[in-house]
């Protein structure tokens, strides 16, 4: 068998079975939810998170007319370091968000499972409490309340 291996028409690599199964599941979920409902859930989730971030006292980096629904960029509070805030979020709350190249901002991805209500509450709470741990004066409760009030636009989109 070894002598004829290279001459045969066999595919001699392992197929990416986990990737194929993951793609199948992702497409199944999209078909089940439908694209219009998925897009609307992402839009509502992003607007709600943006409102919560601003209500707690943080400033968003991008002007409202230019914002995307897929990522939220947050200005790092004065006299703090985004890497330190992100480290606290990771270590204390098991929440990962991104920094940026060249700018001291924090970015929260707003796609897929992040646009589920329980994940929105978790990331906003982790962000607020991590900033407070670094001495930033924020009203985390007000931010959480604003997030919640923006999510009730249509609860159907946010079923977990």
Predicted regions: what is each one?
Residues 1-55, 159-160:
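Active-site C-terminal subdomain of aminotransferase-like
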Residues 25-36, 47, 51-58, 77, ...:
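Generic secondary-structure signature for well-ordered alpha-helical cores
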Residues 92-107:
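Conserved PLP cofactor-binding pocket of PLP-dependent enzymes
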Residues 59-89:
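Conserved PLP-binding catalytic core of the aspartate aminotransferase-like
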Residues 70-74, 104-109:
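A generic structural motif
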Residues 106-160:
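PLP-dependent enzyme catalytic core of the Aspartate aminotransferase-like
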Residues 34-41, 57-64, 98-102, 134-145:
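Flexible, glycine/charged-enriched surface loops at secondary-structure junctions
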Residues 83-92, 122-127:
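Short amphipathic alpha-helices in soluble, non-transmembrane regions
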């Amino acid at each position: 068998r070894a002598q004829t291996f290279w001459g045969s028409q066999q595919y001699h690599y392992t197929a990416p079975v986990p990737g194929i199964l993951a793609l199948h599941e992702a497409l199944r979920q999209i078909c089940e939810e439908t694209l219009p409902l998925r897009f609307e859930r992402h839009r509502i989730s992003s607007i709600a998170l943006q409102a919560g971030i601003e209500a707690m006292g943080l400033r968003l980096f991008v002007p409202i007319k230019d914002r995307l629904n897929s990522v939220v960029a947050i200005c790092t509070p004065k006299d703090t370091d985004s890497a330190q805030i992100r480290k606290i979020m990771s270590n204390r709350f098991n929440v990962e968000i991104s920094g940026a190249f060249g700018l001291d901002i924090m970015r929260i991805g707003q796609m897929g499972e992040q646009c589920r209500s329980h994940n929105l509450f978790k990331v906003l709470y982790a962000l607020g409490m991590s900033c407070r741990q670094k001495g930033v004066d924020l009203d985390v409760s007000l931010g959480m309340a604003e997030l919640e009030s923006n999510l009730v636009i249509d609860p159907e989109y946010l079923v977990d």
